[in-house]
């Protein structure tokens, strides 16, 4: 299994747009956008000169299967947030989350030299919460009725892991290093 992260380029925008509008992908996202190529291009260009975000396409054996990002990169306070989705749902359940989780932790703490990695997850997305907890992230709080979507309010948990914690536990996990462009 060869997994790699390649920088998003303009040729990826139509595929990202397709993934981003799938109900099974947006179910646990804050928005359900009706995207166009015009809005995709605008988003893409907004990321190009923005040092506080990084976006990659997730490739599995050369096939583009999803998107991963680091955002809110704060070098002063040494923290950032992250998120990802597997847009091609036929690739879910293959251990990809393990590789992404461990390698992003290494990238954030070793390459970017940050101290904390955060994320926000719908409380109903128990599978993802469990994955984050498995690799050392802890729930730091709950944002009550934080997202209004499809006529309902949803609670969100905030999660985080620090550099020290990851350094202390990473030896317990066996994972291959992946190429991050």
Predicted features along the sequence, with ranges:
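Acyl-donor (CoA/ACP) binding surface of acyl/acetyltransferases
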Residues: 2-15, 61-181
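Short, hydrophobic secondary-structure boundary micro-motifs
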Residues: 27-29, 56, 169
């Amino acid at each position: 299994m060869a997994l790699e992260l390649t920088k998003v380029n303009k040729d990826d925008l139509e595929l990202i747009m397709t993934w981003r509008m799938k109900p099974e992908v947006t179910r646990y996202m804050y928005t359900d956008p009706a995207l166009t190529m015009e809005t995709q291009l605008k988003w893409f260009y907004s990321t190009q000169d923005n040092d506080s975000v990084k976006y990659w396409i997730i490739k599995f054996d050369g096939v583009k299967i999803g998107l991963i990002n680091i955002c809110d990169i704060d070098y002063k306070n040494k923290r950032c947030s992250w998120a990802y989705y597997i847009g091609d749902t036929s690739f879910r359940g293959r251990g990809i989350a393990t590789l992404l989780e461990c390698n992003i932790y290494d990238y954030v703490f070793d390459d970017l030299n940050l101290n904390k990695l955060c994320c926000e997850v719908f409380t109903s997305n128990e599978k993802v919460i469990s994955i984050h907890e498995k690799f050392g992230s802890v729930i730091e709080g709950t944002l009550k009725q934080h997202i209004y979507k499809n006529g309902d309010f949803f609670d969100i948990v905030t999660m985080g892991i620090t550099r020290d914690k990851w350094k202390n536990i990473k030896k317990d996990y066996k994972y291959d290093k992946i190429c991050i462009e």
